Regions:
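Short, surface-exposed amphipathic charged segments that create phosphate/polyanion-binding patches used
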Residues: 105-109, 243-251, 371-372, 421-433
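Hard-cation-handling environments
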Residues: 183-330, 342-343, 393, 400-404, ...
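C-terminal, active-site-flanking charged/polar segments
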Residues: 315, 390-434
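Generic long, charged, amphipathic alpha-helical segments
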Residues: 343-374
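Charged, amphipathic alpha-helical linkers/stalks
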Residues: 415-475
Length: 490
């Protein structure tokens, strides 16, 4: 479907894996309405612009290299102007508000407890004398998360489209003691005179950590360090926290609202400091007092967190505390897997700091949580379509749904189609192959060889740059290259 032919986008929540391509659709001609909740609209307003800034920065960096090598210029996926155009199309609605999109289509958004403003979406469709109801789960939240409500259940649907991020695993039976574990990490680190550096996702996770720290301070759980300071060093996280504070009513859970009604901001406490400018960020590491530093990105792949790692990883008295998932190949994953040294800004940094993982924090319902959410239907849907997961996970969860509830379930591939009126699968779609489907050993081998080829190309460029070198130096350079070739020509 051409973007210009689309009338509406129904957006479940603001996370970039769900909202991030909307400016591209606008760039390609979409001019309809983006229906979502008020909190999601507020978050998208800052997150899409931030994403666009990253796209523009990457394009600028690539093009500096391209101009030097004579390669064609790289165009950003979308620009800040595209993101601004997208945010102007946001049409927010309240939770529980049933609205008519057009003749034959009505929708309602319900809190699904994944992120501030996140929603499942009920869609009523009427064509002729046939009416069907489809429910899209969005990302179903975990229960007992701080700040936001537990997932709200939906009573009925003819069809359910459900996510399966954790459709093949559980978070464990024990209820984690986040505050107790976090207090231990802070105490042990501060006693040694070190900093606790927390790579944290700017939206959602940072606010949860602030909530825990407020509780630690309010309950005086660290009496020996009552005035410790906490730095939030991420402009996006600061903006997102302001959005949380703006969207209290209707989004915060009972416990958080109790605090609000007492005049207490659940995300504010003595010793909280925010840094906007780069100069303010740099000053943090000149302060020798033990402190907490919260900074993005959560997987340490970009952002100011890399500067804080450079200044703290080599210090045995410091702790790097991870509070979110670390994808394979990221710097964060390397650190939690025991890397002895890492490269930051061209410098090898020895890892002497203690590496901790605050386990159990997840914004996603696990396998049992997803099943419980389906149990909330008073009548099980006629068919369940499982999406938003790895292929093996979606297939596993679809079979689990069939075995548990006795209703037909399947995991469609890209382009899969279902006749809703007749409840028939027209096409299952086409599997899009991923490079990650290859065996890890092959991937590593290919990656290593690609780096080797890149190194060889760089060497050739260096040779060309040295045209006109003095004969004596050129002969020396040639000998070094020949010796290297002889060493590996076997």
């Amino acid at each position: 479907v051409a973007p210009g032919d689309v009338d509406y986008i129904l957006l479940t929540h603001a996370h970039i894996d769900h909202s991030g391509n909307i400016p591209l659709l606008v760039k390609k001609g979409f001019s309809g309405e983006i229906i979502t909740t008020f909190a999601t609209a507020d978050l998208c307003d800052i997150m899409l612009r931030d994403s666009a800034h990253i796209q523009e920065f990457e394009a600028e960096w690539r093009n500096r290299k391209a101009r030097r090598s004579g390669e064609p210029e790289y165009e950003p996926i979308y620009t800040v102007a595209d993101a601004d155009a997208a945010t102007k199309l946001l049409a927010p609605v309240d939770y529980g508000q049933k609205i008519t999109l057009c003749d034959g289509i009505e929708v309602r958004f319900n809190d699904v407890g994944h992120l501030l403003g996140s929603a499942s979406i009920e869609v009523w469709i009427t064509e002729g004398d046939v009416s069907k109801k489809v429910v899209f789960s969005g990302d179903v939240g975990n229960v007992n998360q701080p700040i936001i409500k537990d997932p709200q259940l939906v009573k009925e649907a003819d069809y359910l489209v459900i996510e399966s991020t954790y459709g093949d695993r559980t978070h464990g039976e024990d209820i984690p003691d986040y505050v107790g574990e976090f207090t231990r990490i802070l105490r042990e680190t501060f006693q040694k005179g070190g900093n606790v550096v927390i790579p944290s996702f700017a939206v959602g996770r940072t606010q949860e950590i602030l909530y825990f720290i407020r509780e630690i301070k309010e309950k005086n759980l660290l009496p020996e360090f009552p005035g410790f300071e906490v730095y939030v060093d991420s402009p996006l996280a600061i903006e997102a926290t302001n959005v949380f504070n703006k969207n209290v009513k209707g989004c915060f859970d009972e416990e958080a609202m109790e605090l609000v009604n007492q005049g207490i901001n659940p995300l504010l406490f003595r010793g909280l400091k925010t840094t906007i400018t780069s100069d303010e960020s740099r000053q943090i590491n000149f302060d020798t007092k033990p402190k907490v530093i919260l900074s993005a990105s959560g997987m340490c792949e970009a952002g100011r967190i890399r500067h804080h790692l450079k200044h703290n990883l080599w210090r045995p008295e410091c702790t790097i505390c991870f509070v979110g998932y670390q994808a394979v190949g990221t710097l964060g994953r390397k650190l939690i897997e025991g890397a002895e040294s890492v490269k930051l800004f061209g410098e090898n940094i020895t890892v002497n700091a203690r590496i901790e993982v605050l386990k159990g924090i997840s914004g996603h319902a696990d396998m049992n949580g997803l099943l419980d959410w389906i149990r909330g239907f008073e009548k099980i849907p006629d068919r369940v379509m499982v999406v938003h997961g790895e292929d093996t996970v979606t297939d596993h969860f679809a079979k689990l749904v069939e075995d548990t509830f006795g209703c037909p379930a399947f995991a469609p591939y890209s382009g899969g189609t279902v006749d809703l009126a007749a409840n028939e699968i027209i096409t299952i779609g086409q599997k899009i192959p991923k490079k990650s489907d290859e065996k890890p050993s092959k991937l590593k081998s290919a990656s290593a060889f690609n780096r080797l080829v890149a190194a060889a190309k760089r060497l050739l460029n260096v040779v060309y740059k040295n045209e006109g070198l003095a004969n004596k130096d050129m002969a020396k350079f040639e000998t070094q290259i020949q010796n290297l070739a002889d060493k590996w020509d076997r």
